[in-house]
Amino acid sequence: MAFSAMAAGCADNSVPKAQLPELDLSNPLLAAWNTPHETPPFSEIELADYEPAFDAAIACSRAEIDAIVNNPKKPTFGNTIVALERQGELLNRIAGLFFNLLEADTSDEMQEIA
């Protein structure tokens, strides 16, 4: 039993790098948050930023999933399950911000986006 666990840990768990779409870094939701504790730059974010950011983040997630699905290496727990769990970081960041604000400080415009 211990041997099989060790063997699984030695498997090649690498995933080819995804070909991510070009991001519009002028959108504050897509750019790095160089703020204390990497908090969102609320003063720079406008409602019009959300839809293009969601579209770009979904495209990134699809590219990351495509890289996992089309990995020529033998599937392992690491290069399949763990990789799927780790993909979508940008989408999670944008959705987390949007849906928290939607609950805390909603507006008709935000409801339309949701």
Locations of the language-model features?
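Bacterial N-terminal signal peptides
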Residues: 1-6
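Zn2+-dependent metallopeptidase catalytic domains
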Residues: 10-114
